Amino acid sequence: MSLQPSKSQADEGEQQTVTVLLGLVRQLAVELQPQHNRSITVTLDSSLDRDLRFDSLSRVELVFRIEHAFGVSLPEQFLATAETPRDLLRAVQRAPSETAPTAAPEVRLAPLEETQSVPLNARTLHDVLEWHCEKHSTRTHIYLYAEGREVEEISYAALLKDAERVAVGLRERGLQPGHTAALMLPTGRDYFSCFIGTMLAGGVPVPLYPPARLPQIEDHLRRHARILSNALASTLITTPEVQPIARLLKSQVPEMRTIVTPAELRSAEAELIKTSAQPGDIAFLQYTSGSTGIPKGVVLTHANLLANIRAIGGVIQVDSTDVFVSWLPLYHDMGLIGAWLGSLYFAYPLVKMSPVKFLTRPQSWLWAIHKHRGTISASPNFGYELCVSKVRDAALEGLDLSSWRVAFNGAEPVSPKTVRRFTERFCEYGFKKESMVPVYGLAESSLGVTFPPMGRLPIIDRIQREPLARSGRATPLRIVTRMRSNLWPAVSLYLAIRFVS
């Protein structure tokens, strides 16, 4: 005989859930806007965006608090789809109980012979991909963790074939050599093939971040109109959800002629007539984050990129036995150049997961390193902080991070406190303290500028000091004043960097 709760008991339980949920939402809203403490009112139909002003990171924090309070596991897409606390309530009521992950079988690729792994004479990214296709076309280049699906393996040959179809589609739609094509796509196979396909068509890719939430597509596009106009983008490659609304951009971006999806590009059947790229040709436009002003487009040539990729590889001593595990967005230089294009050049596999997967489940990054025996990974400081503050011990049982030899920490200020907390906590799971590698870079240098010596423990010093790190061998630098004279010592410093990249 089973005991079913009465209707009144069920109603009481739901009301308690509502009360706790609204309390969590209001508490976070107050923390974000303490000056409006008394005026913040939260109902089941309050808009998370308009009324409570929750951005993507605020939503991530809210998910952590809800899961902890109710002991449930919310779906990853929840971050993008929830619009009100009522949506949160439905998700909590439908969510399964949270379960600890189990250790997954390891995935390994056979190492390549040293003479087969690196295209030393390649002069462009086209040369790099074609070289690998000639040497080991079926070797797995990318392990892609797509939402709701099993891991997808993409070989060098598969990437080139897919990219060539995209290139034909772009040519048929009028993309001219040297013209820019903006990519507003989420992490996935489409992004990789459309990026390479644009280059094969003779165009210049312009990576842009996709809208985080569907209800905000129009606002997102409006904010990007200035970048699209500045880039003289004649083509926008995006998702079917964005495509209809993106047509509104044509009045704000005079050069915009084509708005197309990856599926439409792949429908072309003609043979690709290849174009010859030169080292000095533009490979893509990398827009800065805009943290110090309006985002600026940085022109990166094939020569720039290959110089920086080779310099970074030399500093950290990579080879084809390495594995790069990344959740970093592909519109950011650390994710695009450091993770993907670096792995493309050096023939070590890239394990790619979406930023949303990491933000909702930070432990998924660590488990991917465990499963694939990852040796290299990277994150801004906040990613390491999330692993320290938002991952419970129960979610780490059986985790082994002993393979992780290079943990880049950059793209934002590095916190000594975070470095200490992360290394101390995860040394219990095999992470080596000397694997933490604080780095400095900027889009104008393609990516990397300074790196500490490999194998050295992080040095945390609070005295006023000028030497910050060693540059790569191909990146000489000096410290100067505003008047460009050599300076030593000083309080206010400028870095004058001269680089091929």
Please place each PLM-identified region on the residue numbering.
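A short helix-loop-beta submotif of the ANL/AMP-binding
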Residues: G188-R213, R226-T235, D322-V323, L341-V351, ...
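Conserved pre-ATP/AMP-binding loop-to-beta segment of ANL
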Residues: S137-T140, A268-Y287, G293-I294, N304, ...
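Phosphopantetheine-dependent thiolation modules in NRPS/PKS and related acyl-activating systems
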Residues: M1-P111, K161, S234
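Conserved AMP-binding/adenylation subdomain of ANL enzymes
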Residues: L306-V323, D333-T375, S389-A394, P453-M454
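Flexible, low-complexity linker/hinge segments
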Residues: E114-R123, V260-I282
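AMP-dependent adenylate-forming
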Residues: V128-I154, A283-L285, T292, G441
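Conserved AMP-binding/adenylate-forming core of the ANL superfamily
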Residues: I142-S193, R213-R222, K274-A277, G297-L306
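Conserved adenylate-forming
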Residues: L221, S229, E241-V260, P355-S501
